[in-house]
Each structure stands twice: as structure tokens, then as C-alpha cells.
Amino acid sequence: MSPHISPSKDTPSQRLPIPLSLPTHLGLLAKAYGVPPASILQLAWGLVLRCYFTTSSSRWGTIDMAHEYKEKKNLPIRCEVLELDDTRSIGWILQNWNDPSVHRHLPAEEDTSNVPVSAGSIVILTEDAKDLEVLRDFELTAEWIICFSTSTEKPLLRLSWRPDVIHSELASHLAQLLERALDTTFLSPDIPLSQINLFSILDHQKLLQWNHQYPQSVNRLVHEMFEDMVAARPQATAVAAWDGEVTYQQLDRLSTRLAIKLQTIDLQPESIVALCFEKSVWAIVAMLGVLRAGGAFLHIDPKHPTARQQAMISTTAARIILCSEQTRDTVSRFDSESLSLVVDRKMFAQEPDHKQVALPSPNNLGPRNAAYIVCTSGSTGLPKAIVVEHVSLCTSVTAQAEAMAVGGESRILQYAAYTFDVSVGDVFTALTHGACVCIPSDWERTQDLVGAINRLDVNQACLTSTVASFLTPMNVPKLQKLTLGGEPASKQCIDLWSGKVALKNVYGPAECTVWCVIQKNASSEIPASNIGRGIGARTWIVHPENHNQLMPIGAVGELLIEGPLVARGYLNDAERTTAVFLERAPSWLATFGPLPPQTRFYKTGDLARFEQNGTLFFEGRKDTQVKLRGQRIELGEIEYQIQQACNPVPPLAVELIETKDLQAPLLGAFITWTGGLEISLDQSAVPNGLGPDLDARSHFNELVSRIQANIDRTLPPYMMPGLYIPVQKLPLSTSGKLDRKVLRQYCTQHTRSFLTASEAESSDVIADDATKDDVALHEIVNPGEITLAQLWAHALGRRMESINAKDNFLSLGGDSLAAMRLVNLAARDAQVTLTVANIFESPVLADQARLLRPLSKTKSLAPFELMTRGEASIEDIVGFAAQQCRLLPAQIEDVYPCTPLQEEMMRDSLSNDRTQMGQEVVQISEELDLVRYQVACASVYRRFPILRTRFIEHSGRLVQVVVREDLCWKQPTSLAEYKALDSRERPALGKPLTRWALTSDGTHFILSLHHAMFDGITLGQIQGAIYAVYQCIPLPPPSVSFATFLAHLDDQNAPLSQESQRFWQSYLCPSASLDASITPETQKIDRPRASCGTQRLVQFTSGEVSALQRHGLTEATLVRGAWACTLARHQQKPHASAFSDVIFGTMLTGRNFHLPGVDMLAAPSLTHVPIRIRIDEGDLNGHSARALLARVQADATAMIPYEHDGMNRIRSIEVQTRAVFNRIRTLLVIQPIPEGLTSVSTSPFPGSIVSGPRVEAKEMGHFHWYGLLVECTLLPTKGFFVRVSYDNKMFGTEQVESLLDDYSTTLHTLANGLMDTDIPASLHV
């Protein structure tokens, strides 16, 4: 019903006369209040618009032919505005009709195409009914027109509409509403507007047709429905998780054993058990075990701030907490007397198997007992704990399974966070209907969802529109059914999936047990806001301020849910329960048939309207509750926590906003700086609250810092405001309420920087010379600083205007990967040199700018140049290489040396059973054009020399040979057989080290390649290039060649330089206590072989990350320092001392020098070096965290010039140094996610990676020769994924698990130590 006047005249309008049942009353009422009859009509139309748009301000366009516009040509359209205050009566409004605060009109517009009207309507007034005939052109162009002849003899009222825009049934309904509004105006001029009800008999008939049947209640226990499936499908897979699979029978036995254990500690019905788990099969065992023991479960997010976790425990009085080994440390920090139990394999290994023991039925447990509790945010700062009963959950999963076609063949993705009620629907809809719950790891959930969906064979998923938009149908070919829920679906997402899957759009607040409304046939033809019909519930639309008043069909009102799936209420909170859960049925319910027993109603606070076919159209929220990225957020809770940090408390508001330059919604906190409120009649822009006062800016920034520090401890990350916006006043509506719409509109008109006052008008901000001098202290002034600020902005993804001369690169979020980007941007775009060491040693922009030097031109290398610097000729080199590779000399493209690590890896695979070969297996989508796919692969094969590289031995050393050849495909008939044979094929000198295969049925692509041929960045380049060529996306010019890279390294055959030897002797100089061994001497072996593995996810809190940035430290530094502390704590020292020296190996990216394009080098640049760190006693408890991590980072920076010296050459320096290497038993690898290195490499490929070079942890022994490897992949989500492989002859499983537990604890200990430490003076801005 949005307004506009369309120029189209293709569709003739339709007309409907509206009878005036009381025509004489019109004149009498007009005379009584001294207004024209037309004013009464306009008031009635305003009441109709108010009903449809739930606004106190109604607008429409008016053409008044009764006065000066007798020409009937170029008729001006005037915008009428009518303010309708609920507390006023119809008579009062007519009496004050000429008061501008009640009724006013904007100046007439000559151009009728730009009429600013609401509801797309034009009201035409005339004294002569004949004049209406000249208005046919208007009837052809406006959506609808109300024509009114005020003739005293025979008043005439007519509705015209365009049927291509307005449905005839809706038009007829509008005509009836207008007729009813006029009758109400005539007969009840003295009643308040709030009591006017336009609901008609026709509306009642339609609602009776849609809601005649009360939903069937399923009066059972949830676990009884699960037990039905155990009996029917005992060997079917119930849960397929990243950490294990269980059948229905196995899940039955595990949950029974847990239930029996819980019953032994006196768990009773209505007792609440808190669950604190990462994504895991054991979380499902815990949920089901609690239910079968008779209790109710409550999920707690292990990543949320401790204060919020504690509030949930306190609110629910949970006296038992079930957790995992990974979350045990989190639970131990709770200030609670609750008993905590770790649920994992160890628990069931220690407990007897009760498979033959019947589970005792809990006393008095019935369908009306609590099944689970879910907490949502609350406006008082405390979470609201919703109590959902068994009957509600059973009714809900039964209705959902039918609506979503869930059955024994369904493999349902469990994506939603456990604290989100959708997870309960995922799990129990599946387990009560014989389906399989598919659970990715937390890392897969955020970093590789496509891969997880394909690896788990998911065919059904429920996702938010945002997440679903990240996927494409081509990439998840097995996904057959997709449900969008948790937030309003976007049209773009529906268009993406429409016709590709069975698409559904659902709605449901947590108080109504997951989903209660569903659009079963979502498609591009149906508006995204159409959420369908109720399931397991009846739906009603009531007046937003009075639930005893039904709204007419098509009018916007509050959505009211009725049925057995409505929750019991809020735990121990009668006041808030009474406010939204109705104790009594509304008075109108009896008119729709016999009252159902124990019916429940929930006032959702959501605005919606009925379409003419009975489906619901979602319109938004009526209060301060919003949804962001699927999370339900009470804005009042955020406002409350901000207020706790402010003294005195200024007027403030938090709103979900979009800015002019950022289209993704985010939370904005509006804080009044001058302190005040103002009435907003014209909805003008909100004035910025700081203006030219630079002192005010400084104080405001201090306030924001204080707020952030406070809410970081009390609110989860998804509730953190993304913007803090200073304003002079908050706008109010005429009713005195905060006008949130004005705040939202204000943000859409300005950029993010302008809103936060960091982007100001320079002429306005700098008020006088003194102020200019103050600004100049931080202002970027010289060309070097300007150049560097531009490079920083690019490397960090910031606006240049937000960077000043005293900013710290690390404090702005820079890390080693960002530093590498900066080095290469400097060389490529500015032709200046900058090293990673420069960046870490001088992180402040002004200091860093002084280190910039002009870049010397990189000399391009001729083929074979690196091999002909001695006595050998090109002919000799080419001939020898051709002979070794069994090729023609013309096929030899280039020959150059290896990196130290390449030679190390290749020689290891030649002399041992470690092949160093990785296999990437891709499942091909049916939609893929195989010919085009193979052409793309062949093109990439020719583009990247590393794919055409072989190794040969020349003069006692290995060198690499680039050959000219086309891609040769293998076509195996069996994937499994090929993988087995290929993995056993040993690499050899002179032979290809990449193998390409496509199964004969075209379903799988297998790329095998030696680890000496790639690193993470190279692999990303290859994958991205294949995708780009397939999609006809132009590739960027080739980056620096591998030969040019090698030319920048020292001669790897020559001894180390004196400078390098001095560095390594000093760095590795052992002390008496040096011993990084964590294994007994009897367990040490010469050539360890890792054959076992484990993995886990470690998350940093936003406070820990902020502390790192404030101290100018990187996450990689924390990871390295914590590992050193862990080794020190576990090592077997020869004697007691106050400190320990630890040493371990590590892999570095090897791209930390100023060679233009090195960040895009498509070749392995990794380097292998030892790391030695001295650990003092204070380092182990976090008391000297900053000092320790500063040493670790300084040592890493100092090592940069020498990191390519190579482990073998370092080992050969002297006997004392060689002895150090005998103590190295562990390898730490830190893998940053290569964001920003190439946009192409992040693009999804049509297919799914089944397995790849990032093999399972236990299989990583094929790629290294350490007894223990710890690989930490840094994640954009502020944490890292740890994979460990180990030789079980050197390390026991319990020992490794203990080591990892200690490592995780140490990471948080050091990070928390930083939070309690002052920022060093060198980092103050």
C-alpha cells in the first residue's frame, strides 16, 4: 500500500460507489463543528489510513476543485497531514481542524509526479459531481482515488483504483472501512480515537474461516517421542557430528546412563541443568539425558562474558552444570555452588553400561513440566528466562515436522547457536521423527560451512537469510530443503534459492517454541515479508495498545499467537510474564466458537497484517526489540548497561541502523552530549552533538572507552554497539515518545565517520589558532606521512581520514598478515621500502614514515640466470635437466635453486616413508560444465610455473626445473581405489609432483601435489584462479616470479654470513637449564612419526583481543608465548631454577621483506627455524604477561632478516649450537587466514571440497618429522583452531590432552594479565 502516482495509463481504473448511509448527518456534523463536509470525509479517510499504517500522522494528496482551480488543467496536488492523538475525540479534532498541530497541508506542487503522500491515495473534492468526469486521467494514474462531491443536494462518494496495483477484494474492503469510519464519525463524535474499532462483520467471517479449528495439543514427553524412534530405527544414525557419530540405539544408551547419573544426585522435575558446550555430539547427549532424568536444560554460551553467564545461572538457579573438557575452565570461573560434570567419552568409559537397566521414571513428571529454558535479553539488564514445557515442545516439533517434511531420510544441519532456541527445533524435530542431526564444528560453522554441509551430506537446513546468502545452490548440491528464519528474509536471498530447493520462510519468537508461522512455498513470486500461516497455533492481529480489539483484515496491528506451543512464561518474573502472556482469553474469542481448554496467548510485540488470502505479512517491531544476524536483542538491555558506565547518565538510545556507506545493519548508540530532548514535528535531521569543540570530542571519546570497557564484561559480542554517535538532543514524537524512526533516517543520510564525529568539516571544526596548534600535534602533515596513511588505510580497511600521525598500527588492529600487506602495498603502489621489522619496531605512523626509502628497481631475471652465475653454461644446464626429466631440451623453461625447506621436505620424502603428498578431493556439482572446468584447470596449469615444477639433483644439491608441458589428466573409474594407489605412489626426482585426475563419471576431481610445491597462500591462489577462469573473471597480472624471490635470498650453498652466525649464536646460546623436552629419555626416538591427532577450538573474548591491541601485540605473539609457557611448565628440568629456557621449531611465512608482489607469490615461501624463549616464574601466572609477550614479539622482529637461513645451516654453526637442536621435539605452526591477499581466492567454487591438503590431524605425520606438531590457524572471529598430531610412542594421549588443556588455560591467563596491565607509554597516542 505504498504511495505513488504512476505515469502508466495501460490499465483502466475500476470504480466502486460508497453509499452514505447517513447523508443528512454529514451536513449537520459539519455545521456543528464549523468545518466543510469535505473535512469530515478527510477525517474518516485519516482514520482508515491510521488503522492500516499504525501511525498517528496520516498523509494523503488532495485535489480541491471546489475553489480556485476551475481550469481543470495542471491541477495541483496538495499534501494533507492529519495528526491523530489517541486521547482525543473525533469532535475535538473537528473543533481544532484549522490548528496546524492537528491538520495542516504542505504547499501545492505543480508537478504531480512527486507528491509526498502516504498510502498512494488522492482525495478529490468538488462541488459539482460532473467535475469528476474530467478526472479520468488521474484515475488511470493513481493507485486509488477517493472522489467526493460535496453537493448539498446529493453527496456522492466513490472509490477508484487500478486493478494491476490494488486487488479488487482489498478495494472493496477499503470501501467498507471508509463507510464504517464515516458512520463512526457521525454517531460517536465524543469517544476517544483509542476506542474506535473499524473491525467489521466481513472481517469476522474471514477470521472464522481461517481460525475455526484450534490446533491439536500433543500431550507427551519429548523423550518418549524419541524412544519411539529408537524402537523403530535403532541402527539409523541419530547424530553425525564433526567429533563422532551415534545411532539411535547408541544415543538412547548414552543418554540413559547420563540420566541415571543425574537421578543419583536427586534431579527432580522442574530442576534446571545448565549446559555449556561447544558444537559437539556430547551436547545432544547432555540435552536428552537431562530430559530423561526429569529436568529442564538451559544452554550457556562459553564465549559470552562471565558476567552474562553468571546472570543466567543466578536467574535460573541452576544447581547442576554439564560441560565439556574444553569448556570446563569457563565453568570453573562461575561464582556458583553448582555441581559441574564433564560429559564426554571419559565419563562413559568410567561409568558402567546401563543398557540392560531400565531408566526409573521421574516422580510426577508430565507434559506440563518444563523441558528447557532459553534466555533472551531483557530491558532491566537481566536476561529473561523463558520456560518451555514438554507439551509445547512436542506440539511444536510435530507441527514443524509436518510443515517442513522431516522424516527418516532427512539429514538436518544443526547450525544455530545452542543459546538460540532454533537449535532446540533442529535437534528435537529430527530426533522425534527419525532424522539425523548433522553438527559441524564451531570452526567449520564460521569458516567452512559449505564444506561441512557437503561432508555431512546435509539435505535440509534452517538458516538465517544472512547466512543462507553466503551459500550458493551450486556449491551445496545435496541440499534439497532450506528454511529461512530467525530474521526477516531478504528478497535477494529468496531470489537466490527460489526454484533450486524446497524453500520455506518461517517466523516464531522463542516464547512460542521455535516456529509458529510458516510460508511453505516461499518463492520470488511471493513477497519476502509474507510469512504464511500459523502451524501448531492460531494467529490474530490486535490493536497494538489493546489486545481486546481485533484489527480489520489488511490493517497493521500486533501479532497475537494462541495455542499449546505458547510457553509457560518468564521464570520467577510475574510482572513481565503478565505483560505479554495473557492470563485470560480476550473478550472477542468467544465469538469464534467454544473456548478451548487451557488456551494460551502470547503478545509478540511484532507488527503484522493479514493478506486477503489469510497469510500474514510481517511489518516489524512495535517496541525496542530487534533481530540482528538471527539474534534477538532487547535494545533496553544495552541502554541499561551503557547507563551503568555513565555518571551522570545522559539521555541515550540504542537503535538498529544502516549508514550511507555501510548497508549492513549494525547497532548504534546515540548519546546526548549537551543533554536534552526535543520535539520532532518535521522529522528533521538530528544535530551532531560535538560541533567544533575539540575538548568535547576528547571527553566523548573517553566516555566511549569507559562504556566499551564496561559492557565488554557484561554483554555478549552480538549486543555490542558498532557505532557511538554524539547528538545534541534526542528527537521525540508529538506524543512524547522517543522517535526512533528519525534516528534511523538520520543515519541513512550520513556516513559512518560523520556520525561518529571523526569526519568533520575542517572549516567548522578548527575554531582558532590555538585549536589549530593542538590539532597539528596529531595531524598528518608531510608527504611521507600522507603516503603511509593511504597505505595503512588500504592494509587495515579503514578510511584515511580516521588515521592520524600518532596512531599505532598494531592498536588499530594490524597483525603480521596486515604488516605483510602493508610492506607489499608500499613497494607496489608507492615505490618505497618498508619491512615487517620496521612496522613492529616503529608502529606509530609518524615514526614509521621516517623509515620510508625509495625502492630500488627490481631487476628482472633471465631464465637460468640463477644457475649460470658459476662456470656452467645455459646449454649444459638445459641438457642436464632435460636428461634427468626425460624431456626434450626445448621443454625446459627454467632452472633455479630450492628454498631450504623445499630441499628438506623433498629429501625427507625420498629417504623415508613420509610421501609429503597431499590430495585435494572435490565433489563436482551436476551443474558444472566439465569441459569448461578442465579447460580452466589447463589454463591455470600453464599460468603457474610451480605446478609444472620437478626436482633434480645437480652438483650435490637439489634444484627445481620448470618444464613446458600440457596438463595430463587421469580418469580413474573408482575414487577410493585411485586415492589408495595415488597415496602410495612415491615422489621421485625428475618426475611430475602434481597429478590431476577426474573420475570417469565426472563426479570427483582429485589434485595431488607435493608439500614442497605449495603453502597456504599458494593453494589459495591456485583454487581462486581455477574459479576465476571458469567464471570468465579476468585474473590480475602475474606477481613476482619464484626466481626473483630466490634471488633475494642468500646463496643457500654458502656458509652463513658472519652476521647471521652472530645472531643465531646469541639467540640460541644455551643456559644451564635449557631443556624443552617433555618426554622421558627412554621414549625419545631418532625419527618420530606422528600417527595420532586431536583438535579443538580456542576463542578469545573481545576484551582479550582489545588488550592485545592496546599493548601493540599480535595474536601470533600470544600464541607463541603461551606455547613457551606451556612447555616450560611441562618440561623435565635437570635442576630447580627461577627460570626456564624452552626451544621448539616453527614454520614462518617467509614473506617478510620488501619485494613487490611477494604477498601474491604463487610458490612456497615457508621457512623452518628454531624458537628459544626464556620463561621466568612470573610469566607462568600472567603477572608479567606484557613483559614476556613484548620479549617474544621483539625477538620475532629481530629474527626477520635471518629467517631464511634455514634449519640445516643454523644447525651447522658450532657444536654448542648443534646440541640445542637435540632438545627440539615440538613444532609450532601459526597459520593466518590469508584475507585480503586475493579477492579471487576467497570465491566459492562450484563443488565441495571433500578432503584436501589440510588433512585430518592424525594424518599430518606425512608432512613433518616431529614427535609433536601444534598447528594454530588464526580465525577472523578472534580465536584459533588447534590441530595436534603426535607420535604415540613418545607422547601418551592423556599427556597430550593435558598439554592442550594447560595451553588453553595459559593463553587466557596471559591475555587476562594484559587486561590488568597499564598500557606502556610508548603506545599512548
Curated annotation (Swiss-Prot):
Residues 893-1310 are annotated as: Condensation. The gene is ORF2. Nonribosomal peptide synthetase; part of the gene cluster that mediates the biosynthesis of the tetrahydropyranyl antifungal agent lanomycin that acts as an inhibitor of CYP51 and blocks the ergosterol biosynthesis. Keywords: Ligase, Phosphopantetheine, Phosphoprotein. This is Nonribosomal peptide synthetase. Its EC number is 6.3.2.-. GO terms for cellular component: cytoplasm. PANTHER family: NONRIBOSOMAL PEPTIDE SYNTHASE ATNA-RELATED (PTHR45527:SF16), NONRIBOSOMAL PEPTIDE SYNTHETASE (PTHR45527). Its cofactor is pantetheine 4'-phosphate. The keyword Ligase applies. InterPro entries: AA_adenyl_dom (IPR010071), ACP-like_sf (IPR036736), AMP-bd_C_sf (IPR045851), AMP-binding_CS (IPR020845), AMP-dep_synth/lig_dom (IPR000873), ANL_N_sf (IPR042099), CAT-like_dom_sf (IPR023213), Condensatn (IPR001242). Belongs to the NRP synthetase family. One of its GO terms (molecular function) is phosphopantetheine binding. It comes from Pyrenophora dematioidea. SUPFAM superfamilies: Acetyl-CoA synthetase-like, ACP-like, CoA-dependent acyltransferases. GO terms for biological process: amino acid activation for nonribosomal peptide biosynthetic process; secondary metabolite biosynthetic process. The keyword Ligase applies.
